[in-house]
């Protein structure tokens, strides 16, 4: 891949600005945790695994900003940093997973001096980024055998390198199949209202030389019924214990259409996206975003002023529509409640 989604460089967090793609490839530098939190909230960085990495790096920056004479003061301020990060996006469980991991690491080194704790947190954030890249490659290896020679794959939103530290989850499966020499092509849903499929997925795949065709969201059923789509692969922001999966709004519609047309529908996600504390998708909090995202496109109005708007950022696909969940530890099928718990224990 010829771009970096996020990295720690010279005690700064550097992110590609995803709101500027595909028109401009711009990298922003962040030196304080509040600006990282705002970047997450403003979708300069997005995608559950990437948000987790950003939160970890934001906490590492925050630890460096803290002025404290005592451990008690330091840890009290660190809790505040973590709370700011936790309030950015409520649905992506990787955010909370990364925050808790950083808190545990800090607590486990409480006996060390404060500068050492700051360096340990920086190292842990970098480790989370490096691990995410390895995890995505493993997801790709596990999912590639599910993609047949000559297949046309439908994907929704962006679950690629831009949504992770690199390589991607759903696009990781597609990349691995392409790297294995399989002749494949991809249909990318544009994914309203933020157009992640149009702006980001198409951009990534074209950079990699993987054939991609862009369609509007309401065309998916048409192409499925015509027999032009062989398999669907999407990412995830949170997966409940029973396999119900929260992903970008519109994913549920794709899954229902896929089942109607007897097309396998797969979810690709790291184990860190599992939330086994939730029995089902009914318990997953769904973020609702500003109405302007629906009523305006690139700053221009596309709806009458004052119209009522609903703008949930995610929906939940019930497990019965999912043919398999592809993780770095393997592919889970069937009894998700049993198999996901077994997977975590491996």
Curated annotation (Swiss-Prot):
Superkingdom of the organism of origin: Bacteria
Keywords for the protein's UniProt record, in alphabetical order: Amino-acid biosynthesis, Isomerase, Methionine biosynthesis
Keyword Transmembrane helix among record annotations: no
Binding site for substrate: 46-48, 89, 196, 247-248
Biochemical pathway: Amino-acid biosynthesis; L-methionine biosynthesis via salvage pathway; L-methionine from S-methyl-5-thio-alpha-D-ribose 1-phosphate: step 1/6
EC number per UniProt: 5.3.1.23
Gene Ontology BP term (one): L-methionine salvage from methylthioadenosine
Active-site positions on this chain: 237
Annotated InterPro entries: IF-2B-related (IPR000649), IF-M1Pi (IPR005251), IF_2B-like_C (IPR042529), Initiation_fac_2B_a/b/d (IPR011559), M1Pi_N (IPR027363), NagB/RpiA_transferase-like (IPR037171)
First-tier enzyme category under EC: isomerase
Keyword flag Amino-acid biosynthesis: yes
Reactions this protein catalyses: 5-(methylsulfanyl)-alpha-D-ribose 1-phosphate = 5-(methylsulfanyl)-D-ribulose 1-phosphate
Molecular function terms, GO-annotated: S-methyl-5-thioribose-1-phosphate isomerase activity
Residues of the site described as Transition state stabilizer: 157
Biological role stated in the UniProt entry: Catalyzes the interconversion of methylthioribose-1-phosphate (MTR-1-P) into methylthioribulose-1-phosphate (MTRu-1-P).
Record-linked HAMAP family: Salvage_MtnA
Family from the record: Belongs to the eIF-2B alpha/beta/delta subunits family. MtnA subfamily.
Protein name, UniProt field: Methylthioribose-1-phosphate isomerase
């Amino acid at each position: 891949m010829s771009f970096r989604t996020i990295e720690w460089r010279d005690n700064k967090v550097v992110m590609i600005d995803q709101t500027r793609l595909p028109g401009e490839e711009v990298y922003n530098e962040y030196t304080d945790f509040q600006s990282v939190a705002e970047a997450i909230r403003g979708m300069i960085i997005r995608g559950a695994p990437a948000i987790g990495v950003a939160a970890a790096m934001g906490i590492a920056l925050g630890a460096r900003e803290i002025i404290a004479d005592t451990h008690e003061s330091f840890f009290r301020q660190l809790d505040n940093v973590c709370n700011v990060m936790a309030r950015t996006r409520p649905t992506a469980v990787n955010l909370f997973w990364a925050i808790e991991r950083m808190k545990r690491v800090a607590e486990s080194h409480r006996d060390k001096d404060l500068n050492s704790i700051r360096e340990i947190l920086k190292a842990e954030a970098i480790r989370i980024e490096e691990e995410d890249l390895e995890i995505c490659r493993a997801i790709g290896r596990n999912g590639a055998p599910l993609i047949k020679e000559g297949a046309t794959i439908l994907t929704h939103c962006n679950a690629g390198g831009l949504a992770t530290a690199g390589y991607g989850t759903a696009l990781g499966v597609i990349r691995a199949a392409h790297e294995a020499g399989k002749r494949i092509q991809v249909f990318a849903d544009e994914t309203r209202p933020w157009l992640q499929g149009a702006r980001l997925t198409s951009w990534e795949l074209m950079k990699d030389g993987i054939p991609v065709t862009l369609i509007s969201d309401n065309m998916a059923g048409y192409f499925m019924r015509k027999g032009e789509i062989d398999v669907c692969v999407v990412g995830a922001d949170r997966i409940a214990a029973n396999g119900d999966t929260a992903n970008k709004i519109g994913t549920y519609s794709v899954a229902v259409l896929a089942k109607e047309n007897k097309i396998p529908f797969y979810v690709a996600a790291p184990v860190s996206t599992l939330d086994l504390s939730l029995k089902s998708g009914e318990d997953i909090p769904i973020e609702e975003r500003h109405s302007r995202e629906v009523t305006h496109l690139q700053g221009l109005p596309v709806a009458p002023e004052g119209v009522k708007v609903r703008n949930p950022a995610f929906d939940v696909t019930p497990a019965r529509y999912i043919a398999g969940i592809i993780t770095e530890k393997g592919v889970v099928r069937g009894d998700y409640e049993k198999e996901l718990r077994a997977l975590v224990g491996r």
